[in-house]
Curated annotation (Swiss-Prot):
Record pathway: Purine metabolism; IMP biosynthesis via de novo pathway; N(2)-formyl-N(1)-(5-phospho-D-ribosyl)glycinamide from N(1)-(5-phospho-D-ribosyl)glycinamide (formate route): step 1/1
GO MF annotations, alphabetized: ATP binding; magnesium ion binding; phosphoribosylglycinamide formyltransferase 2 activity; phosphoribosylglycinamide formyltransferase activity
Keyword match Nucleotide-binding: yes
Matches recorded under InterPro entries: ATP-grasp, ATP-grasp_carboxylate-amine, ATP_grasp_subdomain_1, PreATP-grasp_dom_sf, PurT, PurT/PurK_preATP-grasp, PurT_C
HAMAP family named among the record's database cross-references: PurT
GO cellular component terms, A-Z: cytosol
PANTHER family (alphabetical): FORMATE-DEPENDENT PHOSPHORIBOSYLGLYCINAMIDE FORMYLTRANSFERASE
Underlying gene: purT
Record's keyword terms, sorted: ATP-binding, Ligase, Magnesium, Metal-binding, Nucleotide-binding, Purine biosynthesis
Name of the protein described by the UniProt record: Formate-dependent phosphoribosylglycinamide formyltransferase
Family: Belongs to the PurK/PurT family.
Enzyme class name: ligase
Length: 393
């Protein structure tokens, strides 16, 4: 039976969030609604989730000693990673010492890099994936590309938001794609994955919740990426019954293997009735921001319920919905957003501004949300709203 105490008192139920971006911010808001005391940790001050947490710490989360010190001082009931770039070996140690890591320390460790999760899916679970090789040197990479064939995709094994990811169409792309992957890795230069390109009809995120009552699948989320980074998403994505059933089978297999409770973002490629596993995040997914307007319980509310052991009897989806990112480029520590009245002038629209303290280059600073009679209309409405927002540096 779940019992939640009073924040900032001896009975408080404490959650420590590792990573404080826009997704973490929404998770904190949902935990706050349930009376949970939230401690936010990230590598820079005033990160979005810190702005709505009870208190925060600035720590390099790849520094296991520093991360452990904060966790031991705060004594949280739940440790909730919101990003991949964490000292996962320390989380494994802490879990073995009795701390509760969401969903599990193993899940955060396996999904921190593409190699762990790809080998689990393809080699242990025998799930359909694109052909792939890993390489540490340019020579091995060139051989792998020759083996996989063109077109193919190269990615650092450790990166996020599409950093370092590119499509190779011929030998002319070989050197520049290698260089780009080496620049884009989260830990600097290093290992890459080379994947055969799947000529898919569309790609989806199947948001999958492991909770006290079992596993719940949300309506599939379609999305459009540029350079591996999400630009817009919509729900529900139309699929054949056979493809949907196969997507749920793949999602169940991989989330069961990772274990624990929480929401997972399972990324899949779909062509006709065929489905291929791509990646999984053991946490809310950026494409799932659409659920802030498309469902009675957003992915963030569902994650909070699952973490706390609360039931999820039903999730109601409100019909065709879409999200479109606000993605300016510039430099500022005092960004402002104008023309919001025009952006919100149509019915069934909403805006989330993330409150990121600075921008240096191109950065996702907010998202516009919309519902309408069709997916096409919802996408167009969300895009109109996003384009109406004026970003001032």
């Amino acid at each position: 039976m779940t019992r939640i105490g009073t924040p900032l008192s001896p009975t408080a139920t404490r959650v420590l969030l590792c990573g404080c971006g826009e997704l973490g911010k929404e998770v904190v808001i949902e935990l706050q609604r349930l009376g949970v005391e939230v401690i936010a940790v990230d590598r820079y001050a005033n990160a979005p989730a810190m702005q709505v947490a009870h208190r925060s710490h600035v720590v390099n989360m790849l520094d296991g000693v520093a991360l452990r010190a904060v966790i031991e001082a705060e004594k949280p009931h739940y440790i909730v990673p919101e990003i991949e770039a964490i000292a996962t070996a320390t989380l494994v140690e802490l879990e073995n010492e009795g701390f509760n890591v969401v969903p599990t320390a193993r899940a955060t460790q396996l999904t921190m890099n593409r190699e762990g999760i790809r080998r689990l899916a393809a080699e242990e679970l025998d799930l359909p994936t694109s052909p792939y090789h890993f390489a540490d040197t340019f020579e091995d990479y060139a051989k792998a590309v020759a083996d996989v064939g063109y077109p193919c995709v190269v990615k650092p094994v450790m990166s996020s938001s599409g950093k370092g990811q590119s499509l190779l169409r011929s030998d002319a792309d070989l050197q520049k794609s290698w260089d780009y992957a080496q620049e884009g890795g989260r830990a600097g230069k290093g290992r890459v994955i080379i994947e055969g390109f799947i000529d898919f009809d569309y790609e989806i995120t199947l948001l999958t919740v492991r909770h006290v009552g079992g596993t719940t699948y949300l309506e599939p989320v379609g999305h459009r990426q540029e350079k591996g980074d999400y630009q817009e998403s919509w729900q529900p994505q139309a699929m054949s019954p056979k493809a949907l059933a196969e997507s749920q089978r793949v999602a169940k297999a991989v989330t069961d293997a990772l274990g624990g409770r929480g929401l997972f973002g399972v990324e899949l490629f779909v062509k006709g009735d065929q489905v291929w596993f791509s990646e999984v995040s053991p946490r809310p997914h950026d494409t799932g921001l659409v659920t802030l307007i498309s469902q009675d319980l957003s992915q963030f509310a569902l994650h909070a319920r699952a973490i706390l052991g609360l039931p999820i009897p039903v999730v109601r989806q409100f019909g065709p919905s879409a999200s479109a990112v606000i993605l300016p480029e510039g430099q500022s520590q005092q960004t402002s957003f104008a023309n919001l009245g025009a952006a919100l002038s149509e019915p069934d629209t909403a805006i989330r501004l993330f409150g990121k303290p600075e921008i240096n280059g191109q950065r996702r600073m907010g998202v516009c949300l919309a519902r309408d009679e069709s997916i096409e209309a919802a996408r167009a409405k969300a895009t109109r709203a996003a384009q109406a927002v004026k970003v001032e540096f």
